[in-house]
């Protein structure tokens, strides 16, 4: 049987990638935080997941956008990560679905992120935005299109992908990365319809709420964070995960390093309130 690491993310058919990505994420679901209730809930984009920790200390909810290079992933593939975020932040996390490529081309995803967020805000005074990888960019697309921007308390972008391909990190880790290679990154942007990143980057919010940029040190797209920080007016806090690769937070519940990093992310979030 094909294993997750045997997949060719640059050339394999997307349905195959989705199948085995889902299986891989299902295999770690048992590492989810045991004292967090997980249930289905509805968004303007469809059915997603709600994570309710046993201990709730803060009333401001987190709206979460999952990663997966815009071609794979769902709230279900990020159950483990979101459950630990909910536990450590002591607040509810809502993971929303969104349209994937190549069936849906950009800017569908960016526009949908704004629609989801505006709908989510209709019944809330304040929210926090968080997302990883592709979702780390989706939160900035969401923030750019929010009608009531003062309702966004903060934004946490976890090893976000912002359309860069030529930095030092891309050259250093692009060929030997376990979780993300440059060939796969180019393929993902192509599936999205964004071989030219300028249209994609133009959809990212450039001002507003405090922004946390979490960078995995051994990640090909680590330099994307520096590129964004140089161009944004968001108040930026940098967090570097030493020795970690892309998507390392999927190891929460099974890695002391991932857990420690998620605790720091939760602390940053909670210090905003």
Q: What role is predicted for each listed range?
A:
Residues 1-54, 273:
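A glycine/proline-hinged amphipathic helix-loop "lid/cap" segment
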Residues 4, 43-49, 56-273:
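Alpha/beta-hydrolase superfamily serine-hydrolase fold, recognizing
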